[in-house]
Amino acid sequence: TLHALANSNQGRIAALASKNLLPVIYPRGDLVASGGLMSYGPDRDEPFRRGARMVDKILKGAKPADMPVEQPTKFELIINLKAAKQIGLTIPPNVLARADGVIR
């Protein structure tokens, strides 16, 4: 799949983007360490916790058809200042202050 292809080549993608002064933005924070500029996406652990709560409700008798569809509610912003410097980008202090994680 395209997702698997991108994941298996994330380092190469980040290196090529950096060489061409292009930012790489990922949907998951764990991918930023490979050289991406930033990530913004749902907290990776939250859906599993939410799923466990839903399973618990079902095991206690709730009907799945009666349960609402849930969407992510917590999103994480991770910024890689090394990558920003490599492509000549300055991240404003107010954006850094809102980040959940900063790679320096």
Predicted regions and their residues:
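Short hydrophobic alpha-helices and adjacent helix-cap/hinge residues
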Residues: T1-R104
